[in-house]
Regions:
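A domain-level signal for the structural core that forms small-molecule/cofactor-binding pockets
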Residues: 1-65
Length: 65
């Protein structure tokens, strides 16, 4: 069944995560017309020292000089 994986920085507020999962599920339900239980949403939180962009670690890219 349809699934969505979100890769991004850590979200500390559980209420924001709940809303994010609900909103994405709402959009999937509208698009696919399946029961809500058919969808899976996974939030993968990545620390800045584990992600690179343009060949540079995020932790280095936004490091204060």
């Amino acid at each position: 069944m349809p699934s969505v994986v979100i890769n991004g920085p850590k979200i500390d507020d559980i209420e924001i995560k709940r809303k994010l999962v609900k909103d994405i599920t709402d959009a999937l339900e509208k698009a696919y017309k399946l029961q809500r239980e058919a969808y899976t949403v996974v939030i993968k939180e990545n620390s800045p020292e584990n992600v690179g962009s343009g060949g540079i670690l995020i932790v280095d890219k936004y490091k204060k000089a």
